[in-house]
Every structure is written in structure tokens, then in C-alpha cells.
Amino acid sequence: MARIAPNEDSTMSTAYIIFNSSVAAVVDTEIANGANVTFSTVTVKEEINANRDFNLVNAQNGKISRAKRWGNEASKCEYFGREINPTEFFIK
């Protein structure tokens, strides 16, 4: 599965991963608002499934939001995410 770099896909926009009623990370994604996603700060290399490069470890579930109400909190957020598999984000 080929990945498109974020600057080559005009449909990507800034969104927030919401977890426990707060912003867990800021991400660039084309995933719809309200979609469930999985995120983690730890990954491991996938050794079995050739369609995946990495797997998340100790992952949490959150939701995607682009609501303006999260903007102020997101501006203070120090965590940024990158989609490593469909609906799975590695947080740095």
C-alpha cells in the first residue's frame, strides 16, 4: 500500500485526537470528524504482515475532531501524530 506524503494530498487537514475529554495530539489526516482512531507513543516493527511496517504498543483509543473548541488547548499541545497504518497514529 503506497503512502502519499502529507504535502502531496490536498485533502489532509489539521485535526486533533481527543482522549479523556482533552487533546492527546495534533495530526494531519483526511480521516473524518468523529472517527475512532488508535494512538500510542510506542511502536514495534511488524515482522509477519507485509502490508504493515509498524504496530502500536500499549495503544489507546480516541476520536478525530476538528472542532474549534479544541483550538486553544491544541495550541499548547506538545504532541504530534503521524498515521502509520489506517486509523493508527504514532505520537511523538
Swiss-Prot record:
Gene Ontology biological process terms in this record: symbiont-mediated suppression of host innate immune response
UniProt keyword Isomerase, yes or no: no
Modulation of this protein's activity: Inhibited by phage protein Aca2 repressor (AC H9C180) both at the transcription and translatio levels.
Superkingdom of this protein's organism: Viruses
Keywords: Host-virus interaction, Inhibition of host innate immune response by virus, Viral immunoevasion
Entry function: Anti-CRISPR protein that inactivates the type I-F CRISPR-Cas systems of the host by blocking its ability to recognize target DNA. Inhibits therefore the degradation of the viral DNA by the host.
Self-association state and partner proteins as the record states: Interacts with host rRNA-guided surveillance complex (Csy complex) used to recognize the invading DNA; this interaction prevents DNA hybridization in the Csy complex. Binds to a the Csy spiral backbone.
Protein's UniProt name: Anti-CRISPR protein AcrF8
